[in-house]
Regions:
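Tryptophan (W) side chains
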Residues: 424, 429, 446-449
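Compositionally biased, low-complexity flexible segments
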Residues: 447-451, 455-463
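Acidic, metal/ion-coordinating pockets
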Residues: 38-371
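Bacterial N-terminal signal peptides
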Residues: 16-28
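Compositionally biased, intrinsically disordered low-complexity segments enriched in Pro/Arg/Gln/His
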Residues: 420, 428-437, 455
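A short C-terminal boundary segment appended to hydrolase-like catalytic domains
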Residues: 352-412, 416-418, 426, 432, ...
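Sec-dependent signal peptide cleavage junction
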Residues: 25-43
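Bacterial Sec-dependent N-terminal signal peptides
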Residues: 1-18
């Protein structure tokens, strides 16, 4: 079990970063480091075992075994623009689907719209640097190509350059987030919280009065596996550090996060979910201010706290945000996260016990290196994603970078301006030239007339 300092870049620090960078504007490198990376402390004890081995699953295939009665969930988090690695995740999904005959879901816990690069104190970051040129769209396009089924939102989906509404309209996967609501819904919930401090049931009733229109996107999603008969309910939670600046929705106050989780779990359970999973972009960092809203805090509250205890168990938390490698909690809590940049992926296998009750049979992490060595990339996904990268940043593969739409527009404007200036200069020059020609012609005519007059006078003996 380990405790860590981890590097990450919360967008909510943008204002602080700007102030510090302004005060120390002569030291631009300092400002950049503040804006893009911070050292966060994770003192929560957890396990980092990478027990998953592709070779073990290949051995099952060789022995004629399969997972036809299982639901397999492959999970990722905090990809941060490393979309060139998605073909390996697609290959992992297709391996379980085609070779082991399992029903497979591919899910993500957020931060798929922003790049991370080494110059921002992320030494092992290797983004394809397509997010800003594409306004975040490359992340969604690559996830479509990889075959994602469900994702929640991270704080970096709300970067100022990201066109989130436009991008999500092109997503072929479900997007869920339960604590991102309309302004009116947030006011209603905050009022209910204030007026019913000692009555959490009243707050649950207020949550229950909300409809899907009161949320930015669907708060939850239930997958009904027709192949296995297992129903899995998912809900998403967004960190309070998100700086919502590119959409009209509002995130709930941190004090409402526990109640929000409790309501979603109860709602999913009431609607028949056998297994309930939180796609969490909360992380495990220590500094949460007055409200402890780490993923482990949510899990412990809905399990043990009399106020927030849910009617059904929270079976698994697939976490993101703090870039932590975690296979399980220090006390066996079912929390899993694959660090970041697709360095690891989670594999969760759900089956049924002898009584026919759904249960999680195994949750393990596998490394990207293992996927590369034993599976290789999915060819179709690789071709599509290579084209996506070439569209926005061909220099990644050694080509000439294509200009962004803003650069193209700027260049067009500059070119138009130069052309207009050139045309105006040419017009003025032509006018001058025509005027000059006219003057020269007039002088020539006058000289011709004068010479003719002089010759006439000489012949007649008249002096000029």
């Amino acid at each position: 079990m380990k405790r860590h300092n981890v590097n990450k870049a919360p967008a909510i620090r943008a204002v602080t970063s700007f102030i510090m960078a302004s005060a120390l504007f002569l030291s631009s490198s300092f400002g950049a480091s503040v804006a893009h990376a911070e050292t966060k402390t994770v003192s929560y004890e957890h396990n980092e075992s990478v027990d998953g081995k592709i070779s073990d699953f290949k051995k099952m295939v060789a022995e004629g075994k399969d997972l036809s009665d299982k639901l397999v969930i492959i999970s990722t988090n905090d990809v941060h623009g490393a979309i060139q690695k998605y073909p390996y995740v697609a290959s992992l999904k297709n391996f379980f689907k085609n070779e082991l005959n399992a029903d497979v879901l591919l899910v993500d816990s957020g931060d798929f719209s922003q790049d991370k690069n080494p110059e921002h104190n992320n030494e092992d970051a290797d983004s394809a640097s397509c997010m800003e040129p594409s306004e975040g769209l490359a992340g969604v396009e690559a996830m479509n190509a990889a075959g994602y089924d469900i994702a929640t939102l991270g704080n970096h989906e709300f970067e100022s350059f990201v066109k989130l509404d436009k991008n999500l309209s092109k997503a072929k996967f479900k997007v869920i987030c339960s604590n991102l609501v309309t302004k009116d819904a947030r006011t209603e919930l905050e009022t209910a919280e204030k007026n019913n401090k000692n009555d959490n049931n009243a707050l649950m009733n207020t949550f229950n009065s909300l409809t899907e229109k009161d949320y930015f996107c669907a708060p939850c999603y239930t997958y009904n596996s027709s192949k296995t008969g297992i129903k899995v309910g998912f809900f998403g939670l967004l960190t309070g550090e998100a700086n919502i600046n590119n959409i009209s929705a509002k995130k709930l106050k941190d004090s409402l996060a526990l109640s929000c989780a409790k309501y979603q779990i109860n709602s999913l359970g009431d609607n028949g979910a056998d297994i309930i999973i939180c796609l969490s972009h909360l992380g495990l960092e220590d500094d949460r201010g007055d409200h402890q809203n780490r993923s482990i805090d949510i899990y412990n509250a809905v399990k043990n706290d009399p106020t927030y205890k849910a009617n059904y168990p929270l079976d698994l938390v697939l976490d993101g945000h703090s870039h932590t490698l975690i296979s399980s909690g220090g006390n066996g809590e079912p929390i899993m996260s694959g660090k970041y940049m697709l360095q690891y992926a989670g594999i969760t296998i759900i089956g049924k016990d002898t009584d026919g009750k759904a249960k999680i049979e195994k949750s393990v992490l596998v490394s990207l290196d293992d996927m590369k060595e034993n599976l290789g990339p999915d060819e179709e996904a690789n071709a599509t994603i290579t084209n996506i990268i070439n569209s926005y940043n061909p220099s990644f593969f050694g080509g000439t970078p294509e200009k962004t739409s803003k650069e193209k527009k700027s260049n067009r404007s500059h070119s138009d301006s130069k052309r207009r200036k050139s045309n105006w200069a040419r017009l003025r020059w032509n006018r001058k030239r025509r005027s000059s020609r006219s003057r020269r012609a007039a002088v020539i005519r006058w000289r011709t007339w004068r010479n003719a007059e002089a010759r006439t006078r000489r012949r007649s003996g008249t002096k000029s």
